């Protein structure tokens, strides 16, 4: 994901919901963790370098 696309995120959340309905909780959690990591990485790339506080290092 190079840029935030709300429609794409909504589609991926819908896929996770389908996986949950099917009863495959492990895969659903794994997919959510991947989505979270991608979104956090994207935010980190778009945020200017701000010095971290000691508890974030």
Swiss-Prot record:
It holds the Pfam family YciZ. Belongs to the UPF0509 family. HAMAP family: UPF0509 (MF_01641). This is UPF0509 protein YciZ.
């Amino acid at each position: 994901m190079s840029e935030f696309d709300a429609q794409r995120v909504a589609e991926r959340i819908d896929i996770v919901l389908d996986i949950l309905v099917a009863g495959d909780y492990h895969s659903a959690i794994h997919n959510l963790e991947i989505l979270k990591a991608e979104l956090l990485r994207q935010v980190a790339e778009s945020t200017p370098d701000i010095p971290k506080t000691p508890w974030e290092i």
